C-alpha cells in the first residue's frame, strides 16, 4: 500500500533561505540596537579623524590647499565653530562651543543685541535651545528643568491650577504633552 500524502500541503510554510538586507535590519526588531551600533561606529570614526588632525598624524602628502586662509595650519587663531555646533572634546564626548557666549565679555567687542527685542544684552544669558543672546526681560526659565529659553523656544503652559503660567523649554514640552 502506498504512502498517503500530507493533507496540509497548503498550510505548510515554504522553508527557503531568505536574504535580509540592511534596510530590513534597520527597520526590524533590532532597529534600535542596529542604529546605536552605526551611531557609535560613526562617532568613533569622527573622533579618530579629529584626533589625527589635532595630533598632525596626516602625512606630508596630504593636500590642504583647498582650505581657506584662516584654517591653514601655522596661522594664529583657532577655527571658530558655527553657531550651535558641538565639538568633540579630548575625552571623546561632545561639548557645546562656548565661544559665542564668551565673545560678549571680550573688551573692545561690539555690543550684542537681544535676539527677541533687539536691546543691548546686559548679561551673558543665552538660550539653551538655540543659543541666541538674550536680555534680562526676554529670558524665561523652564519650569521643568531650569534651563534658559527665549520667546521662540519657550512654550507657555496655562494650567487649570493656581500656578498660572508656566514656561517650558522644547525638550520638557515634549514630555508634558
From Swiss-Prot:
Keywords: Apoptosis, Cytoplasm, Metal-binding, Nucleus, Phosphoprotein, Zinc. Its cofactor is Zn(2+). The keyword Translocase does not apply. GO terms for molecular function: CD27 receptor binding; tumor necrosis factor receptor binding; virus receptor activity; zinc ion binding. GO terms for cellular component: cytoplasm; nucleoplasm. GO terms for biological process: extrinsic apoptotic signaling pathway. The keyword Cytoplasm applies. Binds 3 Zn(2+) ions. Induction: By ischemia. The modification Phosphotyrosine is found at residue 34. In post-ischemic kidney, found in cells lining the S3 segment of proximal tubules at 12 hours and 1 day post-ischemia. At five and seven days post-ischemia, found in epithelial cells of papillary proliferations in regenerating tubules. Residues 36-55 are annotated as: Interaction with BCL2L1 isoform Bcl-x(L) and inhibition of BCL2L1 anti-apoptotic activity. Induces CD27-mediated apoptosis. Inhibits BCL2L1 isoform Bcl-x(L) anti-apoptotic activity. Inhibits activation of NF-kappa-B and promotes T-cell receptor-mediated apoptosis. Binds through its N-terminal region to the C-terminus of CD27 and to PXMP2/PMP22. Binds to the C-terminus of TNFRSF18/GITR. Binds to BCL2L1/BCLX isoform Bcl-x(L) but not to BAX. This is Apoptosis regulatory protein Siva. The gene is Siva1.
Amino acid at each position: 500500500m502506498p504512502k498517503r500524502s500530507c493533507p496540509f500541503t497548503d498550510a505548510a510554510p515554504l522553508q527557503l533561505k531568505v536574504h535580509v538586507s540592511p534596510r530590513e535590519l534597520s527597520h526590524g526588531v533590532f532597529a534600535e540596537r542596529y542604529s546605536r551600533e552605526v551611531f557609535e561606529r560613526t562617532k568613533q570614526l569622527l573622533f579618530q579623524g579629529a584626533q589625527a588632525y589635532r595630533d598632525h598624524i596626516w602625512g606630508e602628502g596630504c593636500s590642504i590647499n583647498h582650505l581657506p586662509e584662516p584654517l591653514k595650519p601655522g596661522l594664529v587663531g583657532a577655527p571658530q565653530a558655527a553657531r550651535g555646533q558641538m565639538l568633540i572634546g579630548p575625552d571623546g564626548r561632545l561639548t557645546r562651543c562656548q565661544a559665542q557666549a564668551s565673545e560678549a565679555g571680550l573688551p573692545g567687542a561690539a555690543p550684542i543685541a537681544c535676539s527677541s527685542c533687539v536691546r543691548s544684552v546686559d548679561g551673558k544669558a543665552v538660550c539653551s535651545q538655540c543659543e541666541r543672546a538674550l536680555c534680562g526681560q526676554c529670558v524665561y526659565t523652564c519650569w521643568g528643568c531650569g534651563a534658559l529659553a527665549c520667546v521662540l523656544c519657550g512654550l507657555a503652559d496655562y494650567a487649570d491650577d493656581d500656578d498660572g503660567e508656566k514656561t517650558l523649554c522644547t525638550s520638557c514640552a515634549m514630555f508634558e504633552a
